[in-house]
Each structure stands twice: as C-alpha cells, then as structure tokens.
Design a protein with these regions (language model features):
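Arginine/glycine-rich "motif VI" loop of SF2 helicases in the C-terminal RecA-like domain
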Residues: 25-26, 86-89, 141
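Conserved strand-to-helix beginnings and helix N-cap segments that scaffold or border functional pockets
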Residues: 17-18, 47-48, 76-80, 109, ...
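Short glycine-rich anion-binding loops that position phosphate/pyrophosphate groups of nucleotides
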Residues: 11, 69-72, 100-103
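Conserved RecA-like P-loop NTPase ATPase core
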Residues: 5, 65, 99, 132
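S-adenosyl-L-methionine/SAH cofactor-binding core of RNA-modifying enzymes
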Residues: 31-95
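N-terminal beta1-alpha1 ligand-phosphate binding loop
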Residues: 1-27
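Structured adenosyl-cofactor binding patch, chiefly the S-adenosyl-L-methionine
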Residues: 106-150
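Short, well-ordered alpha-helix to beta-strand connector turns
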Residues: 28, 61-62, 112-113
Length: 151
C-alpha cells in the first residue's frame, strides 16, 4: 500500500522540510508528498477552494485520513495496526491530509475515512508534517518488528 501525505501550503526550504523528507523517504511503500498552495481567499470560501484542490489531487479510491484537532487520538501501535488492516484488505493508497490555516472544508471531512489528531494541542502546520512523516515511518518499523520503536 502506498502512503502519501497531502497538505495545504508549500513547505519550501526549511528544517521542517528536511525532516519530513528524511522520514518520508525511508518509507518502503511511499506514495507522494502532495502540496497545494494556500487559497488567496480567506474564510469559508478559501477553505472550500483549498478542499476542492486537495481532493482533486488524491489518488482514486484512496483511504483518506484527515488530521484535525477534533480527531481520534491513536497510539503509535494503533496507527500501525490500522495501516496493517488496510494493507490486508487490499487497499492500494492511503493519504494523510493536513489542512490549511483554517482547517479542512466540509467536503474533505465528508470524503474522509478516518479523522485523527495529534493530541489536544495546536501545532504549526510544518511541524505536523514532520510529526506525521515520523509516525508513518514508526508504524512501518512497528509492523516490521524493527527496534526503532523502542530504541
């Protein structure tokens, strides 16, 4: 199963960008890092525009996991179990989506198969990308029974 990260906003050259790529490039079944520009329009119209562009960039019939502060909190082991169950079910693509500054549009939430959170705190978007890439790599290492998870 290919695993991709889709995000609103360009990462540019930054320490966070380097960290995202460090972990993402270690994934054995990586898909794509999909970035879409933030909308030039603010408010609800901007959020809808971002959502439309994000959804248009996704692979057909992918499992869409939306990151949102109101999502479910899962342990690293539970993330790994979820990824494993999708692989076992023959899912070809899973995409983890990070919204723009105003969050995800209703269309993105409606298309989501799962909504996850990184705790109750609010995190900078670029840091969330790095945290997500690391957790996806950690999930792969858990499934491979590699000592990384307990190192």
């Amino acid at each position: 199963m290919r695993i991709s990260i889709a995000a609103i906003g360009k990462s540019g050259q930054s320490p966070e960008h380097d960290l995202v790529h460090r972990y993402f490039n270690r994934l054995p079944h990586k898909g794509a890092l999909i970035e879409r520009d933030s909308s030039k329009t603010s408010g609800l119209a901007g959020k809808r525009d971002e959502g439309k562009r994000l959804l248009a960039a996704l692979p057909a019939q992918c499992k869409l996991v939306v990151l949102d502060e109101n999502g479910v909190n899962l342990s690293s082991v539970k993330w790994a179990e979820q990824i494993s169950s999708w692989r076992d079910a023959g899912i070809r693509d899973a995409v983890f989506a990070i919204g723009g500054a105003d969050g995800h549009s209703e269309d993105v939430f409606a298309a989501a198969d799962k909504t996850l959170a990184f705790g109750v705190q609010t995190w900078p978007h670029m840091l969330v990308r790095a945290m997500l890439a690391e957790q996806l790599y950690r999930a792969e290492m858990i499934l491979a029974r590699h000592p990384y998870h307990h190192a």
